[in-house]
Amino acid sequence: KGTFYIVTTNMYSQIDRNKPNKTKSNTNFIITAKNPAGPWSEPHVIEGAGGIDPDLFFDDNGKVYFVGTHNPGDMYSNGIGAIWAQELDLENWKLVGDRHSIWEGACDKRHTEGPHIYKEHGKYYLLVAEGGTSFHHAVMMAASDDIFGPYETGLRNPILTSRHLSKKNWVHSTGHADLVKLKDGRWFMVSLGKRNDRDGHSNMGRETHLMPVVWESQIVRWQQISKTKWEPVSYLFPVVAP
């Protein structure tokens, strides 16, 4: 408490003359400050933390977790991505314990990235971006009783997207979201999105959008309670408010 953290990726490309394509590499690091206006610390590089768009989760038991992405294949060729989590030692800025691959996404399971974990209603909620950052951009969410899973997805995923709308819709490519809870109990979502002009151009690129959300019950699975009877298992999930 009393410390601000920024965790981000330093990503770069370099040309290998022996290969026709660019070689991509990255480093994830954390900086801290007592005031968001600064001064900020020197970067603490987290060795072994690959992937992009990481986040930190501070659990109520005092443990801190680094949440990032990894690629079962080549993310830049086949789009497959997954989310991993591992405990982080903030005293020494090192990953400790085992690494767990916790989710691959909900719908098309491509370019799963930008993870955020929240603990609400007695469960861990994992929010991710999926589908790339263009017209198939979307926000997915899953829930679990344990931070390392297994995570179960609501049947109403994606909880935010514009992929089903015309490319002429005035806001499109919505995704890469985060949730914020106000002191009065209200919830809001911030996400990326593009605004089109009359000719369909997005001159401002990706902008940040703000919208209210509410938590509603969603079925995650059906469980058999007798030979002839099944009942739904439901969790609360955030949805964009009207």
Residue ranges and their predicted role:
Residues 1-242:
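Carbohydrate-active catalytic/glycan-binding domains of CAZyme proteins
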